Amino acid sequence: MARIGIVVSEFNYDITYLMLQKAISHARFLGLEITYVFKVPGTYEIPFAVANLLKRNDVDGVVALGAVIKGATKHDELVASQTARKLMDLMIQYGKPVGLGIIGPGATRMQALERVEDYARRAVEAVAKMINRSKSLEEKKFAGETVFIE
């Protein structure tokens, strides 16, 4: 059974709490074991928590959940883009998948609420698929014909 951690932002917690509940439910449906739920103050802090979980032996992948709501400035764009960039870097650094379940930038509160289930579910599914496909790749060997990992 694959083991995952979930990192969830407490900022806009009315939205991210719902995302967390959907993510937990979907992870269990897919047969994933949730070893840790790590709450952070905001989306900006998500990469720190993800890095701490990815270095653990009892975590095969991490789901990152947050909601970056559009404000009067471009702060939402900065936070969302830098967080996503760092999460990609951490995946490569640790060789473990990270599911991006961060709503925004540019989303209104209403749009974020409409996207809760979709973003949470897709982030969990991405991690589950990548964990399984990475394990599948380790078990395969090229023997003259193309090997499909799916």
From Swiss-Prot:
Catalytic activity: (2S)-2-hydroxy-3-oxobutyl phosphate + 5-amino-6-(D-ribitylamino)uracil = 6,7-dimethyl-8-(1-D-ribityl)lumazine + phosphate + 2 H2O + H(+)
Acyltransferase is among the record's keywords: no
Broadest EC class assigned to this enzyme: transferase
Binding site for 5-amino-6-(D-ribitylamino)uracil: F11, T43, Y44, E45, A67, V68, I69, L100
GO molecular function per UniProt: 6,7-dimethyl-8-ribityllumazine synthase activity
E.C. number: 2.5.1.78
Cellular component terms per the entry's GO annotation: riboflavin synthase complex
Residues annotated as catalytic: H75 (proton donor)
PANTHER family tied to this protein: 6,7-DIMETHYL-8-RIBITYLLUMAZINE SYNTHASE, 6,7-DIMETHYL-8-RIBITYLLUMAZINE SYNTHASE DMRL SYNTHASE LUMAZINE SYNTHASE
Name of protein: 6,7-dimethyl-8-ribityllumazine synthase
Species, as recorded: Staphylothermus marinus (strain ATCC 43588 / DSM 3639 / JCM 9404 / F1)
